[in-house]
């Protein structure tokens, strides 16, 4: 199978033998469907089943972290008994679960443009006609996206309704003052952190989350970009009231949320945030002892988040050193 994005067929020897059959083999075997008919958009999911001892219910994958959804890179380790092989989890109705998952992924793909354009329109409208409500509006958009990932509607109009209602409710805090706005921004970060810790699907299968065709879990580039606003605004607002340690706390929270291996797993977003925080602190404080201590504390928190979270996009890039990390970011 040729991957046009990665430049065609991979180099090296074939690791697996592939056979075609008109009937399901008795096993052990991995049975899967593959795309046929020339070039196709990478937006369809194909069936796969592992016929062997210990596999019941739906398949699980460390590559996707979504039960029932696996990546093509999982096939070879499973067939060869290597690290990174597929697992499984019990399910009374695996076919129904897979149908629901596929429908949910399709619904999110269809709703993504609607939710994004409506979100931007609401933020621009609030910034134009009610500037005091811009930060609450941002919070409303991000919290609505998280709520939609948790409740999993399959109709775009429900997504739009939840988004509008959440932003409208958030505008009630427009006149609440900078401290409340700062706490609201920090609360958005905490909500995403907790959501990814409880059930990664709440973010992964949200309208603004990953598309499940190249990136499966954590934060999408779009969502990571929107999540730049809460940490930067929250850190500055709480710093003005509570001092440098409030700034450091919000910065640490955001870096763990965005870059932590068990959470956002977005190395590029974490680097952007880190640079932004350092620039903000340097402009306000200059390069003094407090900045050095705060920066060291943030670095320690981020390192712990990467170390204890297992393998992710970020740790895989870091394993190849600075050159590999630069290639991944580029």
Can you annotate each of these PLM segments?
Residues 67, 91-93, 113-116, 202-203, ...:
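Hydrophobic alpha-helical transmembrane segments
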Residues 115-120, 293-299:
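Hydrophobic H-region at the start of alpha-helical membrane spans
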Residues 46-49, 59-79, 101, 105, ...:
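Long, contiguous hydrophobic alpha-helical segments, chiefly transmembrane helices and signal peptides
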Residues 175-298, 305-324:
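Generic detector of multi-pass transmembrane helix bundles and their immediately adjacent loops
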Residues 1-105:
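Soluble extramembrane regions of membrane proteins in the secretory/endomembrane system
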Residues 43, 70, 74, 142, ...:
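Generic recognition of stable, solvent-exposed alpha-helical segments in well-folded globular domains
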Residues 99-211, 224-236:
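Core alpha-helical transmembrane segments of integral membrane proteins
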Residues 325-330:
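Long, compositionally biased charged/polar accessory segments in the mid-to-C-terminal portions
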